[in-house]
């Protein structure tokens, strides 16, 4: 049984798990990782492992030298690899008498509120039982529009869901740099990132391996999601899993992202990062100030443009005049209705729409600001 409230989510990527040339699993990494996570569990930490590698393992099993690009092939190869991957984890953890559970998620499990809550309850029960859940995206059934796209985002959403204290992103570099150190000799290491301080990095240039789907840009997105939920995030070298206890003890290893001082509520986090926006609203400067600085609801008068087609209750992006996304929210009107009442005063809504609508386009209770 768990003896502490501290939950640690560890994500290991394909580039750390597998050989970049052959796609074969690196047992020299997996073995120490399993030992470290088991040790943490016995110390009283609640531990969740988010593991990539199913496609890479599947390719190796089939003798493929390159990662497939066709969706059907990727899903089939993932089905081949996931079974072998979880079997290996079970063998390694069983040798240390540590029970594990396989948890395969799709984006749809987090989009629908009832499924989100149920997934959270399942994690809570597993952790209470002293089990280490091993999480991966269910690539075999996930449709392209509802994919996480990378396990960095998945790990951050899981950390947010279970209200973890730590998210450790194990990758193929020691830490975050201002640019790709392999290409730019002036690249500077970044030791710590504080909330609210702009981060100047060339994340897109810090690439990914041929077997993975992530990169440094996806890890920054993951850090944004997790820190908004009050989670401390660390990016560090996946080939050194033995450093994880030292990180939890406060040693300056890798790049640390400090959590937001006032984490958003679970519902606001679900709106901001769990849902998939179906459109966007462009706001004028006054509406941006009202929403972002004064914590007010969005009125139709502050909307200058609508993009996309959606119904009332859909999730949408809220953008400033330059197109920068500043918030997400659940709309009270459809896209067609909003096009009729954008820029109009609240008192004019009944005359324009022909019925007594609500005053707000997005109520502040259904609106979540982004970092």
UniProtKB/Swiss-Prot annotation:
<feature type="binding site">
    <location>
        <position position="151"/>
    </location>
    <ligand>
        <name>substrate</name>
    </ligand>
</feature>
<dbReference type="GO" id="GO:0004349">
    <property type="term" value="F:glutamate 5-kinase activity"/>
</dbReference>
<keyword id="KW-0641">Proline biosynthesis</keyword>
<dbReference type="GO" id="GO:0003723">
    <property type="term" value="F:RNA binding"/>
</dbReference>
<keyword id="KW-0418">Kinase</keyword>
<feature type="binding site">
    <location>
        <position position="11"/>
    </location>
    <ligand>
        <name>ATP</name>
    </ligand>
</feature>
<feature type="binding site">
    <location>
        <begin position="171"/>
        <end position="172"/>
    </location>
    <ligand>
        <name>ATP</name>
    </ligand>
</feature>
<dbReference type="InterPro" id="IPR036974">
    <property type="entry name" value="PUA_sf"/>
</dbReference>
<keyword id="KW-0808">Transferase</keyword>
<dbReference type="InterPro" id="IPR019797">
    <property type="entry name" value="Glutamate_5-kinase_CS"/>
</dbReference>
<dbReference type="InterPro" id="IPR015947">
    <property type="entry name" value="PUA-like_sf"/>
</dbReference>
<dbReference type="InterPro" id="IPR002478">
    <property type="entry name" value="PUA"/>
</dbReference>
<keyword id="KW-0028">Amino-acid biosynthesis</keyword>
<dbReference type="GO" id="GO:0005524">
    <property type="term" value="F:ATP binding"/>
</dbReference>
<dbReference type="InterPro" id="IPR001057">
    <property type="entry name" value="Glu/AcGlu_kinase"/>
</dbReference>
<protein>
    <recommendedName>
        <fullName>Glutamate 5-kinase</fullName>
        <ecNumber>2.7.2.11</ecNumber>
    </recommendedName>
</protein>
<dbReference type="GO" id="GO:0055129">
    <property type="term" value="P:L-proline biosynthetic process"/>
</dbReference>
<feature type="binding site">
    <location>
        <position position="52"/>
    </location>
    <ligand>
        <name>substrate</name>
    </ligand>
</feature>
<keyword id="KW-0547">Nucleotide-binding</keyword>
<comment type="similarity">
    <text>Belongs to the glutamate 5-kinase family.</text>
</comment>
<feature type="binding site">
    <location>
        <position position="139"/>
    </location>
    <ligand>
        <name>substrate</name>
    </ligand>
</feature>
<dbReference type="InterPro" id="IPR005715">
    <property type="entry name" value="Glu_5kinase/COase_Synthase"/>
</dbReference>
<dbReference type="Pfam" id="PF00696">
    <property type="entry name" value="AA_kinase"/>
</dbReference>
<dbReference type="InterPro" id="IPR041739">
    <property type="entry name" value="G5K_ProB"/>
</dbReference>
<comment type="function">
    <text>Catalyzes the transfer of a phosphate group to glutamate to form L-glutamate 5-phosphate.</text>
</comment>
<dbReference type="InterPro" id="IPR036393">
    <property type="entry name" value="AceGlu_kinase-like_sf"/>
</dbReference>
<keyword id="KW-0067">ATP-binding</keyword>
<comment type="pathway">
    <text>Amino-acid biosynthesis; L-proline biosynthesis; L-glutamate 5-semialdehyde from L-glutamate: step 1/2.</text>
</comment>
<keyword id="KW-0963">Cytoplasm</keyword>
<dbReference type="InterPro" id="IPR011529">
    <property type="entry name" value="Glu_5kinase"/>
</dbReference>
<dbReference type="GO" id="GO:0005829">
    <property type="term" value="C:cytosol"/>
</dbReference>
<feature type="binding site">
    <location>
        <begin position="213"/>
        <end position="219"/>
    </location>
    <ligand>
        <name>ATP</name>
    </ligand>
</feature>
<dbReference type="Pfam" id="PF01472">
    <property type="entry name" value="PUA"/>
</dbReference>
<feature type="domain" description="PUA">
    <location>
        <begin position="278"/>
        <end position="356"/>
    </location>
</feature>
<dbReference type="InterPro" id="IPR001048">
    <property type="entry name" value="Asp/Glu/Uridylate_kinase"/>
</dbReference>
